[in-house]
Amino acid sequence: MQRSLDSLAGMATSAFGAGTSAAMRQATSPKTILEYIINFFTCGGVRRKNEAQYKELIDTMADTLKSSMPDRGAPLPENIILEDMDGCRVEFNLPGENNEAEQVIVRVSKGDHSETREIPLVSFEKICRVLLFRYEFSIPQDSVMLTAQGGMNLKGAVLTGANLTAENLCGADLSGADLDGAVLFMADCDGANLKGANLSGASLGDSNLMNACLEDTIMCGATLDRANLTGANLQHASLLGCSMVECLCSGANMEHANISGATLIRADMSGATLQGATIMAADMEGAILTRANLRKASFISTNLDGADLAEANLNNTCFKDCTLTHLRT
């Protein structure tokens, strides 16, 4: 019995104290020689059983939080109880009147026996917010809740038309996600992974996308006015018809991106890499391209009136039928 309680306490600590892929693997691996032997002869039976219990813990926690909170922005309850987890009671006691410690106390009990653990409050709150976020937007719960960097795991999530205004998505994994028509106005996506995501028609005005990975993203018709894309990776991104007025793209990597039809009036693209990029019928009036790498970029029927190309790399750059009046070089 003690070993069963210890195992469940370990799972709860890993799930709600770390929430990462590494934590899940460690918590669900066989622990004893006997478990390793059984796991071998059942082709991973022990691990599968542990993974099912781990997932049940997460699903039950999500349901409990949803039923006890008016909305996901509300304070977490000081005491959260998960009943009948494999015949056990799992209790999370947050700092407050009944817990003077700065940690969340996890207590797993069955009859007269119990096991106690402690987990960081910051990690616990972050994981609970992920569960509530996924619940609100009808995204199936996942055993991996956080990335190794501590961002939300939303890989492949369907968030079409979702209102994510001012949402904290720092370091989130949104690779392959569908954000068609989503509203991310003023969202903080610093360091987020959006590789291969669909952001067509999304509203990203005034958002923070510093150092975000937007490689291979589809952003046709998206609005990025005044967005901060400093240091972002936009290699092979499709930015057809995007509105990027006064967008900050300093140091961004836009190699082989398609920026045709985009509006980049007064955009700051200083030090950006646009090597091999396709820019057709774009409006780049007053754009700042100082020290930008424009090698082999193709500018066709693009308005570059008043643009600043001082110290830009123009090796094999093509300018065809472009407006180049008042150009600064």
Roles of regions detected by a PLM:
Residues 9, 34, 38, 42, ...:
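Residue-level detector of alpha-helical secondary structure
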Residues 12, 36-37, 88, 295, ...:
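N-terminal leader/targeting signatures
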Residues 44-48:
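Noncatalytic N-terminal accessory/assembly modules of large enzymes
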Residues 89-153:
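N-terminal capping/linker segments that flank leucine-rich repeat
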Residues 137-329:
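Tandem repeat scaffolds
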